[in-house]
Amino acid sequence: MKDTFQRSINYMRISITDLCNLRCQYCMPEKGIYKKTHQDILTLEEIEQIVRIGAENGINKVRITGGEPLVRKGVIGLIKNISNIPGIQDIALTTNGLLIKKYGEALKDAGLKRINISIDSLRPDRYKEITRGGDLSQVLEGIQEALRLGMTPVKLNVVVIGGYNEDEIEDFANLTVDDPIDVRFIELMPIGEASGWAKDRFLSNEEVKSKIEGLVPIITDATSPARLYRLPGAKGRVGFINPISSHFCESCNRIRVTSDGKLKPCLHSNHEIDLLRVARENPEQIGAVLSNGIQLKPEKHYLYTNKHEMSARSMSEIGG
């Protein structure tokens, strides 16, 4: 499917829960979020149906997100079913890593191809602070489990926060040397909990990159948001995702579906289409709604302009 700007849209990011077993400061309020009823979120069958119809209309890549997707009961079966949908070539998962050791084998057997792990510090005390209680050792065990299972390259998503973890940039980059790990530095975005302090703590990826010596640029997939580099002799890669300082809207190939069934043509727009209602009342219209949503994708986001409306949703509600 192509949008009005002739971008090919083949990638669906679908959040299966807004619940999480962490409370990261820039993602979720300390007390958590209002717990929706089962009636208010997509069932696993509805998620599968949406992906199936998406595949019939050109979607071939799917990423399962949250919240923390591994806290949703039935996630293994969902991944297995999606991986068997004709046309789906790639299925990936974004997780905080705490439950990979527990579910890794089952995830691989279900057909999961790739895994992204969100981790913003390699220091136990600091990690516990930013996540409001997380155990770093569990995440590190999860990374090793993903490597053992061959889900490579294992991608680590690192949000760089000025005055907080910028002194760990080189430590993260060095993780790519001995293992097939891709470390991707992501600029802090003004969404939800982060909107109040994103400007004060924002660090551009040009600044981040300047702190890593010896990076060599490598060829990057044009549709990937990450600009990739490699340290000399490294098995993995270092990537930079710059949604603020150098957006990649011109090559955007994705749509998002939230756990409560809202189709979001753009992460940074408040415009949403109620796909949950369509799935329950007129499921035969799902394909048309997906197509319409794609046509409504804006040319670019308008962060930090007078056209931008700050999202009231947390990142866990939208889907990370």
From Swiss-Prot:
EC number(s) recorded for this UniProt protein: 4.1.99.22
Pathway where it operates: Cofactor biosynthesis; molybdopterin biosynthesis
Transmembrane annotation, as ranges: none
List of residues binding S-adenosyl-L-methionine: Y26, G67, S118, M189
Catalytic activity: GTP + AH2 + S-adenosyl-L-methionine = (8S)-3',8-cyclo-7,8-dihydroguanosine 5'-triphosphate + 5'-deoxyadenosine + L-methionine + A + H(+)
Species assigned in the record: Alkaliphilus metalliredigens (strain QYMF)
Cysteines engaged in disulfide bonds, as pairs: none
HAMAP family: MoaA_B
Binding site for GTP: R13, R63, T94, K155, R254, I255, R256
Alphabetical list of PROSITE patterns matching this protein: MOAA_NIFB_PQQE, RADICAL_SAM
Radical SAM core domain sequence ranges: 4-226
Positions that bind [4Fe-4S] cluster 2: C249, C252, C266
Function: Catalyzes the cyclization of GTP to (8S)-3',8-cyclo-7,8-dihydroguanosine 5'-triphosphate.
Complex formation: Monomer and homodimer.
Gene3D superfamilies: Aldolase class I
Keywords from the UniProt entry: 4Fe-4S, GTP-binding, Iron, Iron-sulfur, Lyase, Metal-binding, Molybdenum cofactor biosynthesis, Nucleotide-binding, S-adenosyl-L-methionine
Database matches in SMART domains: Elp3
A single GO BP: Mo-molybdopterin cofactor biosynthetic process
The protein's name in its UniProt record: GTP 3',8-cyclase
Cofactor(s) this protein requires: [4Fe-4S] cluster
Main EC class the enzyme belongs to: lyase
Gene Ontology MF annotations: 4 iron, 4 sulfur cluster binding; cyclic pyranopterin monophosphate synthase activity; GTP 3',8'-cyclase activity; GTP binding; metal ion binding; S-adenosyl-L-methionine binding
Family: Belongs to the radical SAM superfamily. MoaA family.
